[in-house]
């Protein structure tokens, strides 16, 4: 269910960024789109999933400056304007989660790659994986601080 919640958050952030909608309006729009059964999912998103998606979005917005700075420092040779907006939305939420949520790194990165593959272009999954692996190396080297992770 968390993967689907992350997809909801990504779709809302994408609509907010690209469509110029307010964040709450974008969230409601994405929630309505995902309200029914969707390809690859047997059940609609539950309230816990909706709450988790909201937490990711509000957390990213609260830490947007720091998350974007980390991404800019990590993504070499890319400007946010050049990046596919789906990839950017996935990366922003994943980096927020890496730094500020207790989710373990490996499943978080794995799900981000799957979402990028589903919504992005041909090379989105490998691009997202490479960027998040570099963020992880920065964390492991002590360059970036994170909250304690769940076991």
Swiss-Prot record:
**Pfam families, sorted:** NusB
What the entry lists under InterPro entries is as follows:
NusB-like_sf, NusB_fam, NusB_RsmB_TIM44
* Record keywords: RNA-binding, Transcription, Transcription antitermination, Transcription regulation
Entry keyword Cell division? no
Molecular function as annotated in GO: RNA binding
Q: Which Gene3D superfamilies match?
A: NusB-like (1.10.940.10)
Q: Which regions span the lipid bilayer?
A: none
Per the record, its GO cellular-component terms are: cytosol
Its BP terms in the Gene Ontology are: DNA-templated transcription termination; transcription antitermination
Query: Which family does this protein fall into?
Result: Belongs to the NusB family.
Please describe what this protein does.
Involved in transcription antitermination. Required for transcription of ribosomal RNA (rRNA) genes. Binds specifically to the boxA antiterminator sequence of the ribosomal RNA (rrn) operons.
Q: Which PANTHER family match?
A: ANTITERMINATION NUSB DOMAIN-CONTAINING PROTEIN, N UTILIZATION SUBSTANCE PROTEIN B-RELATED
In Swiss-Prot or TrEMBL terms, this protein is called Transcription antitermination protein NusB
Species of provenance: Thermus thermophilus (strain ATCC 27634 / DSM 579 / HB8)
């Amino acid at each position: 269910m968390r993967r689907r919640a992350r997809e909801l958050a990504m779709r809302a952030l994408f609509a907010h960024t690209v469509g110029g909608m307010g964040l709450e309006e974008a969230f409601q729009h994405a929630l309505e789109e995902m309200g029914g059964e969707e390809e690859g999912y047997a059940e609609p998103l539950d309230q816990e999933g909706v709450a988790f998606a909201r937490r990711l979005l509000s957390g990213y917005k609260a830490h947007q400056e720091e998350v974007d700075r980390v991404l800019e420092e990590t993504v070499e040779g890319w400007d946010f304007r050049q990046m596919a907006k789906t990839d950017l939305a996935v990366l922003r939420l994943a980096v927020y989660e890496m730094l500020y949520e207790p989710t373990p790194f490996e499943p978080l990165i794995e799900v981000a790659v799957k979402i990028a593959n589903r919504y992005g272009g041909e090379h989105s999954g490998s691009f997202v994986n490479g960027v998040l692996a570099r963020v992880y190396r920065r964390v492991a080297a002590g360059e970036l601080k994170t909250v304690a992770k769940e076991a």
